[in-house]
Amino acid sequence: MNIFAEAIVNKNTENGDITDTVFGAIEDVMEKAHGGYAGLYLINGVGIVGFRDPHGIRPIVFGSRSPKGNSQVPGTPAKMSKARRSLDYVMASESVAIDTLGFSLVRDIKAGEAIFIDMKTGDCHTRQCHRDASLSPCIFEYVYFARPDSIMDGVSVYESRLKMGEKLADKITRRFPDHDIDVVIPIPDTSRTSALQAAYILGRPFREGFIKNRYIARTFIMPGQAVRKKSVRLKLNTIKSEFAGRNVLLVDDSVVRGTTASEIVDMAREAGALKVYLASAAPPIRYPNIYGIDIPTQTELIAYERNTAQIAEKIGCDWIVYQDTEDLVDAVRSSASLEQPLDSKWMHSFIIVNCCKILYLT
C-alpha cells in the first residue's frame, strides 16, 4: 500500500492524466513488490483500482451490472457533470461476492493486469502492467480458502473438490483393496464436498459426525500450537452415534501441522470409533508457502522429514492417505470451463506453488 501511495504521488507530478498516473503507479508496485498479492484500492475522489501480481498467485475478479436508479456518476454534483455511467462495477477476491451483490461476473483480473474505474466518468480502463506476466495460481485456494460456489480462473471450486474426493477414493481403493471402512465423515467445513464424493465412490455411507461452532475462527490461521489445539474442542463436537462401534474414515482438506488432525482423531476414539483412518484431499505439505499462507517454518509441518507411517503414528490414526500431487492438479485443471480451458503450462505452475515442491516463483 505504501509503495502504491508513494508511486501515485510521484506519477501525479509527472503526468496530468489520471489513468496513466494510476497504471504507472501499479507498474512501479509490480517492479518492487515480489510475491503473491491482489490489491484493491479506493482512491478518494478518483476511482477504484484492482490489480493482480505478475504470477496471478492470489485471485481477484470483477463484475458489472446495469446501474439502478439515478445513473449519475457517484461523487459528482449533478450541476457540474453530464457524465452518466453505462455500468456499475465491483471487484472482489472471489466470484461469490459478486453474485451475492447482484452483479454478473465479467472475468478474472489477469496476472500482472490492473483495472481502473474512473469515478468521474464511470469508464472502466484495463492495462497489462507487467511484461513478463504468467498465470501460476496457488492451488491451496481451491483446496481450502475459496468457498465452493466460487469460480476462479474459469475453475468451479465445487467441481474441483468433487474430483479431489473421487481421486482420493480411487487411491484408497488401490492401497487398501480390502479396507474395512464403515462410514465416511468430513472434518467441517471445507472437506465436506470431497468427503461426499469419496463416500460415493467407496460405496460407503456419508455421515456428519462433527458439529461445528461457527463462532470459532479457522484453527489453521490461529497463532501457536497450544491455541490451535484448545480451539479444536471449542470448534467441534461429536455426534457419538456416528462413531460408536465403527471403523471411520475422516476426510480433511489438508493436514498441515497435524495439530487439528491429532485432536480430532482423539475425539473420534473418545466417541467410540473402533478404528480411525484419515484421508487428505491435498498432498503432504513439506515446505513453507511464502505467498501469503501462514506456514512460516518447515519444522511446524508434520509431513516434513516423515513418511506416511510416521505421520499416522504422530497423529494417532490407524493409517493416513494423501492425495497425489498429479491427481490434485488434474482435479483442478479438469474442472475448468470449456470457454476458458487451462493449458499445460498453467497446470505445471501449480506444482511449483502448492507447498509440495521446493521451487519458488519469486
Feature map (PLM): residue ranges:
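Long C-terminal interaction/binding lobes of large macromolecular proteins
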Residues: 244
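N-terminal segments that mediate ammonia production and transfer
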Residues: 1-191, 199-240, 334-340, 344, ...
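Gly/Ser/Thr-rich beta-alpha loop segments that engage phosphate groups in nucleotides
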Residues: 54, 58, 260, 294
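Extended, hydrophobic alpha-helical segments in both membrane/secreted and soluble proteins
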Residues: 184-187, 191-198, 202, 206, ...
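PRPP-dependent phosphoribosyltransferase catalytic core
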Residues: 28-30, 45-47, 52, 79-81, ...
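Short, electropositive, low-hydrophobicity segments enriched in small/polar residues
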Residues: 60, 67, 116, 195, ...
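Short, contiguous acidic/charged loop-to-helix segments that flank catalytic cores in large enzymes
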Residues: 156, 237-239, 250-256, 296-302
